[in-house]
């Protein structure tokens, strides 16, 4: 399985003004924007970390997901939420011949934590032996910062501020996440039962 981001979050969607206010940086100076590239980097790092911990796409972007077989032919759970649209479904055989599956043969079952690609009939199309299925989908809470739930938006600002304030710290342990951030994102994390984990 290979999950790829096909589109990036545009700079205009990043909450740079809100982040500067959160950090209490001075304003009204000729060089107000001198740190913008650095601040954008911390915001992108915080977004990526929270998306990784929660399995959620925060700001809308397109993904492609390549897999060798369906987890269940009656419905394939998608690896990221919330999904707003399935853009395409393509089957490729071992010699890379493509078969585009018509949108009338599948549907999106929306779910806040575990959206599922479902067949319109009884089963999803058979993935060719030695081939793959590629699902292209759009996921995220919306196109702008204001579309995020308030607690996730606050978690991003807190984590980006943590990265900014500890930018020269090298002794932090791996996976370190401030308690306030961890508690804000906890309800968005996937629950894993019976050791199967997310697939």
Per-region residue spans from a language model:
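Divalent metal-cofactor coordination and adjacent catalytic microenvironments
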Residues: 1-199
């Amino acid at each position: 399985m290979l999950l790829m981001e096909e589109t990036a979050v545009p700079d205009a969607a990043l909450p740079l003004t809100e982040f500067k206010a959160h950090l209490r940086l001075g304003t009204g100076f000729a060089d107000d924007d001198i740190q913008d590239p650095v601040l954008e980097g911390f915001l992108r790092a915080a977004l990526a970390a929270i998306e990784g911990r929660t399995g959620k796409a925060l700001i809308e972007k397109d993904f492609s997901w390549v897999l060798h077989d369906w987890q269940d032919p009656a419905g394939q759970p998608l690896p990221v939420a919330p999904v707003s649209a399935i853009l395409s479904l393509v089957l490729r055989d071992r010699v890379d011949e493509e078969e585009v599956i018509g949108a009338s043969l599948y549907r999106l079952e929306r779910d806040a934590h575990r959206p599922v690609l479902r067949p319109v009939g009884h089963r999803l199309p058979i993935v060719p032996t030695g081939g793959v299925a590629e699902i292209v989908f759009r996921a995220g809470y919306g196109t702008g910062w204001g579309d995020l739930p308030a607690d996730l938006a606050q978690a991003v600002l807190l984590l980006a501020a943590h990265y900014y304030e500890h930018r020269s710290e090298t002794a932090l342990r791996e996976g370190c996440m401030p308690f306030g951030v961890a508690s804000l994102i906890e309800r968005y994390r996937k629950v894993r039962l019976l050791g199967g984990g997310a697939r």
